[in-house]
């Protein structure tokens, strides 16, 4: 029994030594590969963080005929299956006391509040008649003022800004160049901070970019060490504030997904449309 056990132990020891040699060789080759990899600082591509700032709808969209029919059906079912509210029970009780009054079976103390529920209903009716719904079509819609945030209230709006690239004015999403030591989301947050004198507050949707776009600089600006830029987009929902008009009139617009094509270049538009939602 001792001989087979000894042979087994020797075989295991030999296999372990071979594994150690292979693993050491693998580690050395990996270290060489990492050492040979070029540094990202020498890349001819500049990194940019862009902000896809969206204003969500502030009113619901008009119902379609099918939705109206379904809503009416659900409301009718709710009425038929619901229980009486406290006010309805009170009104029923007062109706019974009114019937007793007609039959001279009431107490004089009940006369003071016998019509209280009806008085409340009359008051609520007057308030309802005085209430007026806000207009869905705003003044900005009538003037087609796309610099105003008070337009297309039932649609999702996206902020675009006009920047100068070489001798061309180009519409893009707000962006800034990445700086060492910050994350790409941090770059997008810095972009938001520089807009409208820091008076806009937004909620970023995650730490990962929702899209990217690569472009080359114009020939006049392009060099071997500066070929172009890679843009990474980050979504954010506008909470408060607006883009300041001071000194920037005509340099920004709030547009729907359908209106993006009026401003963006075709290739840039194709990338942006992938992640812009139209709620």
UniProtKB/Swiss-Prot annotation:
GO terms for biological process: mitochondrial translation. It is found in: Mitochondrion. One of its GO terms (cellular component) is mitochondrial inner membrane. It comes from Homo sapiens. The lineage of its organism: Eukaryota, Metazoa, Chordata, Craniata, Vertebrata. Keywords: Acetylation, Mitochondrion, Ribonucleoprotein, Ribosomal protein, Transit peptide. The modification N6-acetyllysine is found at residue 230. GO terms for molecular function: structural constituent of ribosome. Gene3D superfamilies: Nucleoside Triphosphate Pyrophosphohydrolase. CDD domains: NUDIX_MRP_L46. This is Large ribosomal subunit protein mL46. Pfam families: MRP-L46 (PF11788).
